[in-house]
Amino acid sequence: MKSLSFLNHEFEAFPSPELALTDPNGLLAIGGDLRPERLLTAYYNGIFPWFNADDPILWWSPDPRAIFMLGKIRISTSLCKYLKKQPWHFTINHAFTSVMAGCAEPRPKQNGTWITDEIQMAYRELHQNGHAHSIEVWEGEQLIGGLYGLAIGQVFCGESMFHRQTNASKAAIVVLQQHLIKRGFKLIDAQVMNPHLESLGAKAIKRTHFIELLTQFRDKKVHPDAWIPSEVFLEL
């Protein structure tokens, strides 16, 4: 039976994702906190927080789930030509806080942001502890795009991306894919499908299939230098 769980500030196990509501799709639990231990446990089990500034903490595990299988991100001929012309350079874990702030900037036709100060503080702590990571896109010394997310074994859980110049966020995800393949990752969890993700090659799969993949890869190791702050190169 589908049911909604209420969490308190005592650390406790999450309910099974299979108990998540169908309307709204994937809502599993309310409450708790954003301590690193709770967040890591959530992602380890295919659950993530998503809530507005005035809401309690909401925990989700939607069905279907959007994922990118590595090597399957779609790079159109026109995008490839465009990116080759840009004087951009790319880094890993050089400006995590600035990337989160960029992702939190208001979007067209969007009121506010779910990347609240509380969320930013929690994920900065995860970054300091070696769990959350960023890709940066630069033009000179100006940050023009990027993305951030969490690494759970061989799975990268993408959280958000942003751009201040056309196609900069697409460049970030292409760089991310290239980096993850080289370091032994298997897939990107993109959480909820939308037209932008679909245009890049994301697939919507059943939650049960996603949990199977997550269980298969979440305890496996990747290359030890995967997240050392460094410059990376776009290969087209």
Curated annotation (Swiss-Prot):
Zinc among keywords: no
Localization: Cytoplasm
Xref: Gene3D superfamilies: Leucyl/phenylalanyl-tRNA-protein transferase, C-terminal domain, Leucyl/phenylalanyl-tRNA-protein transferase, N-terminal domain
Swiss-Prot/TrEMBL catalytic activity: N-terminal L-lysyl-[protein] + L-leucyl-tRNA(Leu) = N-terminal L-leucyl-L-lysyl-[protein] + tRNA(Leu) + H(+); N-terminal L-arginyl-[protein] + L-leucyl-tRNA(Leu) = N-terminal L-leucyl-L-arginyl-[protein] + tRNA(Leu) + H(+); L-phenylalanyl-tRNA(Phe) + an N-terminal L-alpha-aminoacyl-[protein] = an N-terminal L-phenylalanyl-L-alpha-aminoacyl-[protein] + tRNA(Phe)
Gene Ontology cellular-component terms listed: cytoplasm
Pfam families the record matches: Leu_Phe_trans
Region forming the signal peptide: none
InterPro entries reported in the protein's UniProt record: Acyl_CoA_acyltransferase, Leu/Phe-tRNA_Trfase, Leu/Phe-tRNA_Trfase_C, Leu/Phe-tRNA_Trfase_N
SUPFAM superfamilies named in the record: Acyl-CoA N-acyltransferases (Nat)
GO biological process: protein catabolic process
EC assignment: 2.3.2.6
Key word Transit peptide present: no
Main localization of the protein described in the UniProt heading: cytoplasm
Keyword terms of this UniProt record: Acyltransferase, Cytoplasm, Transferase
Coiled coil, from the record: none
Alphabetized GO MF terms: leucyl-tRNA--protein transferase activity
Functional description taken from the UniProt entry: Functions in the N-end rule pathway of protein degradation where it conjugates Leu, Phe and, less efficiently, Met from aminoacyl-tRNAs to the N-termini of proteins containing an N-terminal arginine or lysine.
NCBIfam families: aat
Family named by the database record: Belongs to the L/F-transferase family.
The protein's name in its UniProt record: Leucyl/phenylalanyl-tRNA--protein transferase
